[in-house]
C-alpha cells in the first residue's frame, strides 16, 4: 500500500487557510484525506469530542509524552499545551491516507526536521488591504487587536519561501482548485504510483 503524504499548511490569520482545508476535506473521501488531530491539556469545550476535535490529556500525560519525544511539535499557549503526535500521524499515513496539518511557521520548522518528506503549502492573501478587510469582517476585535494581528501576519508571511508550494487566496474557488491540484500532482509522483500499482507493473513487465 502506498504511504500517505503529510501536508503542512500555514498562513497568516485571515488568509482563509482553515476554510480552504475544510472545503477540500468535503470534496475528498475520508479514506483519502484527513486533518491532523492534536493533543491538548485544555478542557473540552461544549460539543468537542475526544479523538475527533482533540485528544484531551492532562498535564502529566502531556509532559510524559514530551519526555519520550512523542510529538512532532508542541507549544504552550496561555497555560495549555498543544502538540502533534508522531505516532498518530504515522498510523494514518501508513494506511495510505493523506494528512493535513494546520500549523504556524515555527511548528512547520519543527516538523520538517522530524519528517523531511512532508510537503508544505503556504497561503497568502491577495493584499494587505484585503487582509485588513477580512480581519475586520469578523467584527469581534478592537483596533489594537487588529493592528497586532496585522503585525503578526506580516511576520508570518516573511517565511513564505520556506515552503514547497505557494497559493494566493484572491478567489476562493481558484485557491481551492490550486490546493486540489497540488494533492493530485503529489499522488501521481513516481514513488507513490509504483507502490500503488506494484501488482499491475509486475504483470505488465512479466515475460
Curated annotation (Swiss-Prot):
Any one Gene Ontology molecular-function term assigned to this protein's record: guanylate kinase activity
UniProt xrefs under Pfam families: Guanylate_kin (PF00625)
Domain Guanylate kinase-like: 4-184
Keyword set includes Transferase: yes
Cross-referenced CDD domains: GMPK
HAMAP family, alphabetized: Guanylate_kinase
Function: Essential for recycling GMP and indirectly, cGMP.
Protein name: Guanylate kinase
Native source species: Shigella boydii serotype 4 (strain Sb227)
Gene: gmk
Amino acid at each position: 500500500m502506498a504511504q500517505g503524504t503529510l501536508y503542512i499548511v500555514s498562513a497568516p490569520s485571515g488568509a482563509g487557510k482553515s476554510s480552504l482545508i475544510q472545503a477540500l476535506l468535503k470534496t475528498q473521501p475520508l479514506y483519502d484525506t484527513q486533518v491532523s488531530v492534536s493533543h491538548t491539556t485544555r478542557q473540552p469545550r461544549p460539543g468537542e469530542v475526544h479523538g475527533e476535535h482533540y485528544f484531551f490529556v492532562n498535564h502529566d500525560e502531556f509532559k510524559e509524552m514530551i519526555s519520550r519525544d512523542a510529538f512532532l511539535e508542541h507549544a504552550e499557549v496561555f497555560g495549555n499545551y498543544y502538540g502533534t503526535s508522531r505516532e498518530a500521524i504515522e498510523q494514518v499515513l501508513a494506511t495510505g491516507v493523506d494528512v493535513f496539518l494546520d500549523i504556524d511557521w515555527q511548528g512547520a520548522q519543527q516538523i520538517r526536521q522530524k519528517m523531511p518528506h512532508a510537503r508544505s503549502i503556504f497561503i497568502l492573501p491577495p493584499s494587505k488591504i484585503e487582509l485588513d478587510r477580512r480581519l475586520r469582517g469578523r467584527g469581534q476585535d478592537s483596533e489594537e487587536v487588529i493592528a497586532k494581528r496585522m503585525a503578526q501576519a506580516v511576520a508570518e508571511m516573511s517565511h513564505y519561501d520556506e515552503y514547497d508550494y505557494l497559493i494566493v487566496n484572491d478567489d476562493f474557488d481558484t485557491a481551492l482548485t490550486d490546493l486540489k491540484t497540488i494533492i493530485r500532482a503529489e499522488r501521481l509522483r513516481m514513488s507513490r504510483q509504483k507502490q500503488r500499482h506494484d501488482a499491475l507493473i509486475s504483470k505488465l513487465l512479466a515475460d
